[in-house]
Amino acid sequence: MLSLSNLQNIIYNPTIPYVSTITEQLKPGSLIVIRGHVPKDSERFQVDFQHGNSLKPRADVAFHFNPRFKRSNCIVCNTLTNEKWGWEEITHDMPFRKEKSFEIVIMVLKNKFHVAVNGKHILLYAHRINPEKIDTLGIFGKVNIHSIGFRFSSDLQSMETSTLGLTQISKENIQKSGKLHLSLPFEARLNASMGPGRTVVVKGEVNTNATSFNVDLVAGRSRDIALHLNPRLNVKAFVRNSFLQDAWGEEERNITCFPFSSGMYFEMIIYCDVREFKVAVNGVHSLEYKHRFKDLSSIDTLAVDGDIRLLDVRSW
């Protein structure tokens, strides 16, 4: 779950129906986190991102997110423009259960919304109304909401990508004006060597027909790979390994829930602890990997390749 300390303008235990102004403009990179509980007798509830709050005529709804429990047991998404609904997009992979708590994380991307529930990617919804017009959040139906939080971010996909805390190595990766993402294969040197307390963040978007990609922490001088993270979407395996003294070690694959799917936006956080690396994806802890390469201070390079659009890399 995302820490509340990372969110702004948190509203606790709002009364439903809930309609309120969103205090800042929603731009790509903005995040909305809604935590709540589905009552036993709920038939449906909805989360609406609106342009205004007018009842007559009814305000436009840029994104209507509507879990339904009676008969259909699905999520219906739609857009309301000039009091007319568009075509429904229906998701049958239903993550909500009656009498169970939930966490909805909605990420605003340049061309679509990305929705995850309880740490699992659920759906993508292409913008039919410019998200910058959204100024109101509405929640309706039979649902108990514990908290609503926001994280307003800069436009990750239209600004020139930054690489805070890294120095790019490959000439082809040097940013050109107007470029929306980093070229692959990507390689960059950390401005400070790896060690306990250090963090690396990789942000990207998985390609639609992705097979796999990899994120590696490398000891530049020896070219040993201390940490090889290799999500394989074709088999839903999150493979971890090390390449030491010109040989791969034993793969680690155990994971509770595979956190990636085609088309999704992700933020991968790699935290170096004394005994292990800890990895989280979109705010949800995924795995630990015990250090096989013991000289942590020799780890000075980040390498990324595979079937993704690489948007941002950071280290501190």
From Swiss-Prot:
Record's protein name: Galectin-8
Keyword Cell membrane on entry: no
A Gene Ontology biological process term: cellular response to virus
Matching SUPFAM superfamilies: Concanavalin A-like lectins/glucanases
Localisation per UniProt entry: Cytoplasmic vesicle; Cytoplasm, Cytosol
CC annotations in GO: cytoplasm; cytoplasmic vesicle; cytosol
CDD domains: GLECT
The record's note on its domains: Contains two homologous but distinct carbohydrate-binding domains.
Listed Pfam families: Gal-bind_lectin (PF00337)
Species name: Rattus norvegicus (Rat)
Domain Galectin: 18-151, 186-316
Function: Beta-galactoside-binding lectin that acts as a sensor of membrane damage caused by infection and restricts the proliferation of infecting pathogens by targeting them for autophagy. Detects membrane rupture by binding beta-galactoside ligands located on the lumenal side of the endosome membrane; these ligands becoming exposed to the cytoplasm following rupture. Restricts infection by initiating autophagy via interaction with CALCOCO2/NDP52. Required to restrict infection of bacterial invasion such as S.typhimurium. Also required to restrict infection of Picornaviridae viruses.
Residues marked Critical for binding to sialylated and sulfated oligosaccharides (site): R58
Top-rank taxon: Eukaryota
Subunit structure: Homodimer. Interacts with CALCOCO2/NDP52. Interacts with PDPN; the interaction is glycosylation-dependent; may participate in connection of the lymphatic endothelium to the surrounding extracellular matrix.
Keyword Lyase set for record: no
Tissue occurrence: Expressed in liver, kidney, cardiac muscle, lung, and brain.
Positions that bind a carbohydrate: R68, N78, E88
Binding site for a beta-D-galactoside: W248, G249, E250, E251, E252, R253, N254
GO molecular function: carbohydrate binding; integrin binding
Signal peptide feature range: none
